[in-house]
Amino acid sequence: MKIAIAGASGRMGRMLIEAVLNDSDAQLVGALDRADSPFLGQDAGAFLGKETGVKLTDDLDAVFAQADYLIDFTRPEGTIAHVAAALRHEVKLVIGTTGFTAEQKAELQAAAARIGIVFAANMSVGVNVTLKLLEFAAKHFSHGYDIEIIEAHHRHKVDAPSGTALMMGEAVAGALGRSLEDCAVYGRQGVTGERDPSTIGFAAVRGGDIVGDHTVLFAGIGERIEITHKSSSRVSYAQGALRAVRFLSARGAGLFDMQDVLGLR
């Protein structure tokens, strides 16, 4: 599997490079970074003390010409540029970027008519199994329980709520036959009045080096149920991304997510 990594100098990019180098079925053939990165020209394995022969570059076409797959955990504007290059070179994409607009998501959908794309806000196996648990719970706590989603991430995260929190909200709303767009409440301040029982609330915490904590609270009278997932390392995301690459190796064009990759549908 000839794999290139986008955002190669970042926290997630470095974890992905390490995972690819440790996978006997994978070959690192490219490492992309932003044009103003101070790491351009450095070996992609330098932070591991390894010589890979792959240099960090901002030359999209040079990287895509070598790769069969790109793993991308960057930012929406960067990912959209990578999608255009992937279409030119017929490279399959594994996308873990969050914070897309509706228009950008439509671009991903259109690209998937020509290339295979796995797009998921969270590629951890644990999170995706948790989504199934939430669907089950929501169906049984549909009346008399208020639903709140609380997430916490490191101080550097730029979007809120997290993509994973939104995935959880969509799983719950879908199980209840609702549209998350219609029932979500993002943060509260001032005199808000009594809680509307048909809503799903979101709260975001940012601080320190928290990798990612997510709790969905079903609060009833006399009891409450909390379903929580906590990430202690990004390694689970990297391993999930490699599972997604293997999944795409046997697929043609189409837009998939980790529920497809893990056979959870």
Swiss-Prot record:
Q: Which residues bind NAD(+)?
A: G7, A8, S9, G10, R11, M12, D33, G96, T97, T98, A120, A121, N122, M123
Identify which top EC class this enzyme belongs to: oxidoreductase
Provide one Gene Ontology biological process annotation: diaminopimelate biosynthetic process
Determine if NAD is one of this entry's keywords.
Answer: yes
Q: What is this protein called?
A: 4-hydroxy-tetrahydrodipicolinate reductase
Q: What is its EC number?
A: 1.17.1.8
Catalytic residues, per the record, are H153 (proton donor/acceptor), K157 (proton donor)
Pfam families found in the cross-reference section: DapB_C, DapB_N
Q: In which pathway does it act?
A: Amino-acid biosynthesis; L-lysine biosynthesis via DAP pathway; (S)-tetrahydrodipicolinate from L-aspartate: step 4/4
| GO CC, one annotated term | cytosol
Annotated (S)-2,3,4,5-tetrahydrodipicolinate binding lies at H154, G163, T164
NCBIfam families reported for this sequence: dapB
Q: What is its main location?
A: cytoplasm
Q: Which reaction does it catalyse?
A: (S)-2,3,4,5-tetrahydrodipicolinate + NAD(+) + H2O = (2S,4S)-4-hydroxy-2,3,4,5-tetrahydrodipicolinate + NADH + H(+); (S)-2,3,4,5-tetrahydrodipicolinate + NADP(+) + H2O = (2S,4S)-4-hydroxy-2,3,4,5-tetrahydrodipicolinate + NADPH + H(+)
Q: Which UniProt keywords apply?
A: Amino-acid biosynthesis, Cytoplasm, Diaminopimelate biosynthesis, Lysine biosynthesis, NAD, NADP, Oxidoreductase
Binding of NADP(+), residues: R34
Q: Keyword Oxidoreductase, does the record have it? A: yes
- State what this protein does: Catalyzes the conversion of 4-hydroxy-tetrahydrodipicolinate (HTPA) to tetrahydrodipicolinate.
Q: Which InterPro entries match?
A: DapB_C (IPR022663), DapB_N (IPR000846), DapB_N_CS (IPR022664), DHDPR_bac (IPR023940), NAD(P)-bd_dom_sf (IPR036291)
Which residues span the membrane? none
Task: Provide the GO MF annotations for this entry.
Answer: 4-hydroxy-tetrahydrodipicolinate reductase; NAD binding; NADP binding; oxidoreductase activity, acting on CH or CH2 groups, NAD or NADP as acceptor
In its UniProt entry, the species of origin is given as Burkholderia ambifaria (strain ATCC BAA-244 / DSM 16087 / CCUG 44356 / LMG 19182 / AMMD)
Q: Where in the cell is it found?
A: Cytoplasm
Family, per entry:
Belongs to the DapB family.
